[in-house]
């Protein structure tokens, strides 16, 4: 997936697409692990669905925030620094690194898919509550960040944004 995104970034001359696909990559990993595990379990399905909700929310937000704004300043700086070597460097430094990080960060989802016929249980319910809390905090944080940077709170001083 990351190599395909890298090729698209070369065509578009915009490495920022890697950010938009960060969350969606987890969706792909979650469902691939679900399919590969061949485990028909409640837990596996719930993990894949929750990963999908989180990944689509994150990818959608990043698309909405960045769409039409051109390449992110970080990648522009890399492009300027590496010059003609940027294409190959971006494969490893940007796309390869994010692919490796995605694999590591998604290990709990991948490992959670490995048990056949796993029921949700009390620990699973606690996990769903923790997930929902995190999902809510991320969503509210994104809305607050946007309000501070572009909306009603733009004139207030919020150094963390």
Located regions from the model:
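Membrane-anchoring alpha-helices and their flanking helix-loop junctions
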Residues: 1-159
């Amino acid at each position: 997936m990351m190599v395909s995104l890298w090729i698209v970034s070369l065509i578009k001359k915009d490495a920022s697409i890697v950010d938009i696909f960060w969350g969606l990559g987890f969706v792909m990993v979650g469902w691939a692990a679900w399919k590969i595990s061949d485990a028909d379990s409640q837990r596996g399905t719930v993990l894949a669905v929750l990963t999908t909700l989180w990944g689509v929310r994150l990818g959608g937000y990043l698309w909405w925030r960045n769409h039409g704004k051109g390449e992110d300043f970080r990648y522009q700086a890399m492009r300027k620094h590496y010059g003609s070597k940027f294409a190959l460097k971006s494969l490893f430094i940007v796309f390869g690194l994010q692919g490796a990080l995605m694999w590591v960060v998604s290990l709990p989802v991948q490992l959670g898919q490995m048990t056949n016929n796993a029921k949700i249980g009390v620990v699973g319910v606690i996990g769903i509550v923790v997930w929902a809390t995190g999902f809510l905090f991320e969503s509210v944080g994104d809305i607050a960040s946007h309000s501070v940077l572009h909306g009603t709170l733009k004139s207030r001083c919020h150094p963390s944004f």
